[in-house]
Amino acid sequence: METMGFVPDYVPKQPYQSWGTEFVVLVEDSKDFISLQHIMVMYFEQDDGSVSKPIVVKHWRQDWKYQDSEINAYVGNNTWKKKRPLWAEKKGAWSQAVYQVDDSPRYQGYGRWEHADSFSSWTSSETWRPLPRREASIRDDYDVMIGTNIQTITPCLL
């Protein structure tokens, strides 16, 4: 959520909310490559207060590759450029490529897993990425987000 601007007289945009349940489906799991498809299941409240039937929507996908030799780096203005990392950058690292709903690239970065007794965690390099569709459709004052992804896996406690 925006709390301030960096130009005079800037007024933060009104926050919005969205709801849904997200499921992740394993598409492929081979030695050095994993592909995960995210699926959204949404319900909407109707004008009469009733709840709609579920709507299932293909959401984003993430592909993981071990010691990836090339990644797509977002450079702004809906443009990506191929980047070939140095061996030291990719050695022992997994890349995470995130794709939008239409399977076009969104962002990609390298990271390494840290394993502890109670969790495993992967932290990406800092990456540029385009605005999410939900923001790009209502915002025109910027077109790049800079982010770091952290994926943490913990034991399932039933």
Which positions does each model-derived feature cover?
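Calycin-type beta-barrel ligand-binding domains and close structural analogs
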Residues: M1, S35-L158
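Short N-terminal edge-element motif at the start of the domain
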Residues: M1-I34
